[in-house]
């Protein structure tokens, strides 16, 4: 046997194994069943053209290990790869959708300059800002009136006790007593200038009568003094004329 026989036999085994490995490797679906690997160089194309039976998809050498046992041909592999290639972008889109939505939820839209929230403490307190009038309940007013009847001025300790008991602040109780004292002074000032009312107590009526009697007595005394002075002056004038 010549050396060329051994070389051809080895070359045929190598090329057949390479072709099977090339078709079985699922590296990329873009490679056809009869495509050439770029790593074999230009010589591989020459050998492949010289032996078309080994590289042909329809040849018996290629179909014997797969088609006999599994009844699968090149079309089945090509269809599987094409369907897988078509589903790749769909799967990628489905996988990236929730991540993109989560990223959008985590990054809320930044408000513009005119959309900032203004809190009450950020607003300026100008002269037009009016404070609401404090309204007291009937129970609070009754308790404060009772205390005012006995004490017109409250101490700090008593004010704190009433603030806790009536659910008010010390400032509110202080203002209420100030207003109540002014009202009381105004009422008593009007009473002193006018006659006593008939519905007042007997003691006040007695005091009023005594004051009237004293006033009349003083008027009488003043008149009597005046008359006595006039009489004495007349007597003196008569004596001087004589």
UniProtKB/Swiss-Prot annotation:
Residues 129-188 bind DNA. One of its GO terms (biological process) is anterior/posterior pattern specification. GO terms for molecular function: DNA-binding transcription factor activity, RNA polymerase II-specific; RNA polymerase II cis-regulatory region sequence-specific DNA binding. Central nervous system including forebrain. Motif KWKK repeats lie at residues 183-186, 210-213. Residues 187-227 are annotated as: Disordered. SMART domains: HOX. Belongs to the Antp homeobox family. Sequence-specific transcription factor which is part of a developmental regulatory system that provides cells with specific positional identities on the anterior-posterior axis. This is Homeobox protein Hox-A7. It comes from Coturnix japonica (Japanese quail). The gene is HOXA7.
């Amino acid at each position: 046997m010549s050396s060329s026989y051994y070389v051809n036999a080895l070359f045929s085994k190598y090329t057949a194994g390479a072709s099977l490995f090339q078709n079985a490797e699922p590296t990329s679906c873009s490679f056809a069943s009869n495509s050439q690997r770029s790593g074999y160089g230009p010589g591989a194309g020459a050998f492949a053209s010289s032996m078309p039976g080994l590289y042909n998809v329809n040849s018996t050498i290629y179909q014997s290990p797969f088609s006999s046992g599994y009844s699968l041909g090149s079309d089945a592999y090509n269809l599987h790869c094409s369907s897988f290639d078509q589903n790749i972008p769909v799967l990628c889109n489905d996988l990236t959708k929730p991540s993109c939505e989560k990223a959008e939820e985590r990054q809320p839209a930044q408000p513009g300059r005119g959309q900032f929230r203004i809190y009450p403490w950020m607003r300026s307190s100008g002269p037009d800002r009016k404070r609401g009038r404090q309204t007291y309940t009937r129970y609070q007013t009754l308790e404060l009136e009772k205390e005012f009847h006995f004490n017109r001025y409250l101490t700090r300790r008593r004010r704190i006790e009433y603030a806790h008991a009536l659910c008010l602040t010390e400032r509110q109780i202080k203002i209420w007593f100030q207003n109540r004292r002014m009202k009381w002074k105004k009422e008593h000032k009007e009473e002193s200038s006018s006659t006593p009312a008939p519905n007042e107590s007997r003691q006040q009526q007695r005091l009023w009568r005594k004051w009237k009697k004293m006033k009349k007595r003083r008027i009488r005394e003043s008149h009597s003094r005046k008359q006595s002075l006039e009489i004495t002056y007349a007597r003196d004038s008569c004596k001087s004329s004589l």
